[in-house]
Amino acid sequence: VVKALQSVVSLPLQLDSSHADALERGLRVYNGKPIVNSVNGEPEVLEKVLPLCKKYGAAVVGLAIDKKGIQPGAEDRVAIARRIKEAALAAGIPQEDLYIDCLTLTASAQQKDVLATVEALHTCKTELGVRTILGVSNISFGLPCRTYLNTTFLTMAMYAGLDLAIMNPSSEEMMAAVYAYNVLTNRDPQSTRYIERYANRVPASTALAQANQNAVAAQGAQPGDAAEVSGPYAPLIKAVEKGLKGDAAAQTRALL
C-alpha cells in the first residue's frame, strides 16, 4: 500500500497501525521521511513504537490520551503530552520531529471542555516547546452550519500556537481564515500572499447581493419594492423596512 500510494502522491504519508510489525514493514519501504500517526501516553505503546520512529527517522504524532481516555481538563492532557515528549527524547527522537495532538472534543457533546483543548495546546507550545497538531473540524460534529464553528475554532487554535491543522484545504472559508490570520499576526509580510489570493475576488455576500439586485431589476422592480415580498408576512416586512414601529407591532400581533 505504501509503495502504491507513493507512486502517485508526492506529499508525505502518515502511517498508522496498531500492530508494530505491520508498521515497521511500512516504514521499511517508505521513500523519504514518514510520519507515524500515532502514539499515545500508554507506556507499552511508547515502548513499541518510538524505537521504530528512531530507527527509520520518522516524525511522530503523540495523542494526549492514555488508558483513562481523553481527560476533560487541560492539565491532565498536558501531563500526558509531557510523558510522551520525555519518552520520545529518551528514544533519541529530535524534539522537532514530535507533534502533540491535544484532541478536539465536539462542542455538541462536551461544550464546557472546548476551551480546555485550546488551553492544553497553548501550554504544550509555550511550556513544552513542542509542535502541535489538531483535527479542527471535529469541533462542529452534530451541529448545523459547521463552517462557522470550524473557522472560529481554527482561529482560536492558531492563536494558541497550532502548527498543523487537520482540515479541508478545499474549504474557502477555512483557507480565508488562515490567510487573514497570517496577515494580522505579521506572518504574511506586506500582506503579499493575501493580496495575491484575494485582490481580484468578490466576497460571496457581495456577489449574492448583486445577483439579487439583478433579479429584481429583471422583473422591473427596485430593491425594497412591494413586489419583492408576498404572502402573510409582506405587511410586516414592509413596516419593518419603513421603520413603522406601530404598524410592525400590530402586524406581529396579528400573526401570532
Task: Label every model-predicted segment.
Residues 1-10, 20-97, 105-133, 137-256:
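ATP-dependent carboxylate/acyl-activation modules
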